[in-house]
Amino acid sequence: MDPSGSDEDADADFDTQVIIQQSLLDVYKPGIAQHTPEAARLHSFPSDDYKKIAEAIETGKEDALAGFAKYHPAFDEANGNGWLPLHKAAVQLNKNILEITMNASEPSTWERTTHNGETALFLAVSSSLLENAHFLLLKGCNPNAKTSEGNSPLLTAVLKDAYDMATLLISHGADVNLRCANERTALHEAAKLGRLDMVKLMLASGAYPDARSSYGFTPLALAAQGGHTGIMQLLLQKGADVHSQASDSSSVLLEAVRGGNPEAVSLLLEYGADANIPKSSGHLPIHVAADKGHFLALKVLVPVTDIAAIKKSGISPVHCAAAGAHPHCLELLIQAGFDVNFMLDQRIRKHYDDQRKSALYFAVSNGDLPSVKLLLSAGALPNQDPVNCLQIALRMGNYELISLLLRHGANVNYFCRVNPLHFPSALQYTLKDEVMLRMLLNYGYDTERCFDCPHGERVHRFCTFEGWTSTVIKDTMFCEVITLSWLQHLSGKVVRVMLDYVDQVQICSKLKAVLEKQRLWPEIHFILANPRSLQHLCRLKIRKCMGRLRLRCPVFMSFLPLPNLLKAYVLYKEYDLFGQERSTGTW
């Protein structure tokens, strides 16, 4: 605390209090504040007369209300919500109450609104009180007065599905083309809600069929969103533009596809809608159908969509079906001949942090096994993306997905672009899981690089491990990783498994020092100190001659002139823990 500034602070607080008090006094000085009738109403409470009138209205006491008619000023008062007695009377079932109240009110109050901008007529319409609305209209109330939200009585009648009310309003001058909230007309709302009778009424009363909302949607587009084919047919017959586009260039056809009604899609195509017009994002109707999983709509769009338009968009519907996890749509597209190896255009890829390109990557990221199977069976390549599909599956720990990718040629020896290690990156996800580790090793993981250390038996120079961050790019050795304090306990098991897949290897001094403390060190030492069996060396030689691609190819293995038992040995089937349906994998 600073005592030197206490006097100044006290003076400042005193001055502030004086200013606040003076301003409050000024507000309530006669002639300064509340100098208008409107301000007086806002700052005053309802009088006793108002309360008596309101009670008579709400309880339906006609005689009592008629007796209060002489208190004209009270009929000009409003409560905290801005409701006049006339507003309260407008929502009563007894029309006589409204007549008495209106006759007692000054004509200047007939168009007065509540704090929400609602007139007495609007309140009667929103309460679906036809007789009250009729009476107010006969008195000359404005049928086109809008609320603060921009809603008109006619639009409210449409929302309430009150056909007779809408007819009444139109007969008394309601504008069917009046722009309401979001620049929508009553026809917009009727079309959106699928109210055919209302649409017919609006069109018969002169509604413009192609009015655009603030987002550029026409009534036809809104009807298409809901799949209201009867209304769409009527609008098209009245000349609605089938080629109209919204502010984002979304076509009516695209909106119909978004709704998923195949009959609506077919109807628009019959009237000449173009399936090759993209929205501003570049997406075509076929993309939307695939993404939403609308199978029947997709089936209609496939034959009418040009491949050139798809290429220009930079994204295939195959991507969309895979991203949305819709294998039934994916199967349809594959059967129709769409390329499963179509890669995202650069302008699309930049929206993804991982710079993904293939449809397979989307399916793997979703853990969508049926879609992955379909794509791989159709020839999808698993090594096309900057982040390898196998890496995503390993991160998930999904055995079946990993096995599926490996059987179709996923590269077990990929290297991450960030923090590349001296050994292939896939290993780091399997250190705690023998099932996944064996999967990688069985499919040709480069185990020898894990034992490749330039220091050998020499003492490693001391250095602190900098950690794995995007700012640390170095050729980190396996011995540096597995000897970390939080991984040392895994070193014995990992190295022991790896020895099943290599010939004689040298263990560097740093790794050896850690292994000597592990339970499996005697077994590891025995293997390292003795020649490997001829059977084991032959397996390694055969695998090396065959190559990784042939090893994972079932067709090639079936034609190999070897006994089945020997084939199984070459493929390390005795170590295929996932194939043996073992559920344990954590050490």
Curated annotation (Swiss-Prot):
PROSITE patterns assigned to the protein according to its UniProt record, in alphabetical order: ANK_REP_REGION, ANK_REPEAT, SOCS
ANK repeat windows: 81-110, 116-145, 149-178, 182-211, 215-244, 248-277, 281-310, 313-342, 355-384, 385-414, 416-449
Effect of deleting the gene: Asb14 silencing promotes cardiomyocyte nuclear proliferation after myocardial infarction in adult.
One Gene Ontology term from the biological process aspect of the record: intracellular signal transduction
Top-rank lineage group of the source organism: Eukaryota
Domain SOCS box: from-to ranges: 521-576
Keyword annotations: ANK repeat, Repeat
Family matches, as InterPro entries: Ankyrin_rpt (IPR002110), Ankyrin_rpt-contain_sf (IPR036770), Dendritic_Spine_Reg/Scaffold (IPR050889), SOCS_box (IPR001496), SOCS_box-like_dom_sf (IPR036036)
The protein's annotated pathway: Protein modification; protein ubiquitination
Comment text on domains: The SOCS box domain mediates the interaction with the Elongin BC complex, an adapter module in different E3 ubiquitin-protein ligase complexes.
PANTHER family in the cross-refs: PROTEIN VAPYRIN, ROLLING PEBBLES, ISOFORM B
Oligomeric form and interacting partners: Interacts with MAPRE2; this interaction promotes MAPRE2 degradation.
Function field: May be a substrate-recognition component of a SCF-like ECS (Elongin-Cullin-SOCS-box protein) E3 ubiquitin-protein ligase complex which mediates the ubiquitination and subsequent proteasomal degradation of target proteins. Plays a role in the inhibition of cardiomyocyte nuclear proliferation by mediating the ubiquitination and degradation of MAPRE2.
Family: Belongs to the ankyrin SOCS box (ASB) family.
Protein name as annotated: Ankyrin repeat and SOCS box protein 14
Organism: Mus musculus (Mouse)
Gene that this polypeptide is encoded by: Asb14
